[in-house]
Amino acid sequence: MSNKLVLVLNCGSSSLKFAIINPVNGEKHLFGQAECLNLPNAQIKWNLNGIQYDTELSSGSTHDEALNFIEKNIYNQQPELLSQLTAIGHRIVHGRDYFTQSVIINDEVIKKIQGSIPFAPLHNPANLIGIYKAKKFFPKLASKNVAVFDTAFHQTMPEQSYLYALPYDLYQKNGIRRYGAHGISHYYVTHEAAKLLNKPVEKINLITCHLGSGGSISAIYHGQCIDTSMGLTPLEGLVMGTRSGDIDPAIIFHMYDILGMSIQQIYTLLTKKSGILGLTGVTSDCRYIEDNYIDKEDARRTINVYCHRLAKYIGAYSTLMDEVLDAVIFTGGIGENAAIVRQLTLSKLTLLGFQIDQNRNFAARFGTSGKITTDNSRPALVIPTNEELVIAQDTARLTA
């Protein structure tokens, strides 16, 4: 076992992922997740050296309480593992345009993360709790905490990509612009794709699709992001589990003026009751629309809208590649496992030279990576993401 390990914390809006990782080889000695935080059915699951554990947390447990449980009940299962920690890495959802790369956390960094809360009101406060607790639990590593931003990879976007057609002073004075999300994942699969395609990352041109409960797509030109689908917040873009993605903004005024809905009701509808959940009326789980695509109208309707939106973005982003599009990459829980989503999406893109290989597509699931198109097709690849490894490696590099 390496004596240089990194603790990675990823505090979501209602979840908390944690892992102790060897940043050199990616081995996870401990990993787990607390789910349904702030809800009656809060629970936590973890794997320590290959052994699986799970337990219920107190009803309504917060991030703070979940971190206390982890410190008291999980870390103490193997104290010698903690003695090998050299640094702590934190996934931070939004850093505005303050950060173009990962940074060691100090008071100024914390202040800027706090200043970004209006752009990620559910996530950044949870991220800050993780930082405060880590410094408290591991005082000897207080100066070895690193922030890795989901927005940083997208800071290479040119002005024509990140500006909205709104009064310019809204950007200058209020920071209203496109920021994107899932940048850590888009960065990882970009570099992995360059290896698989045997091409220097600074010459690779890709369209990367991170498809999970949240979803985003990025145009990668010469290894850098030049456009991405999520905007000021993670609500814009693709159809997602419970988020609408792109809509006509006037729908909001219609719901407010004509339907009499409050601003909070509209916000909840767009973020919690739309997307796959809204279209099916049953569930936000993509496996439902996969399993019932043939037999149920709601599933068929939903997957058709989902894949139409995704294909439309891929087609649009392909026009940004001045030279050649090397490949389309699928990652994230849906991107890595939903063969039917990949098939239906690529079937709409034959004009771009994509031809699905049914056997390869079906085989590339459940952690298996690889090419899913025919030999004479433009390549499409499945690459399982590994955000924790990126965070661990950035953390180790900055604190070495």
From Swiss-Prot:
CDD domains registered for this protein in UniProt: ASKHA_NBD_AcK_PK
A GO BP annotation: acetate metabolic process
Parts forming coiled coils: none
Annotated binding of ATP, by residue: 17, 210-214, 285-287, 333-337
GO molecular function annotations of the record: acetate kinase activity; ATP binding; magnesium ion binding
PROSITE patterns assigned: ACETATE_KINASE_1, ACETATE_KINASE_2
Family: Belongs to the acetokinase family.
Descriptive protein name: Acetate kinase
Species assigned in the record: Baumannia cicadellinicola subsp. Homalodisca coagulata
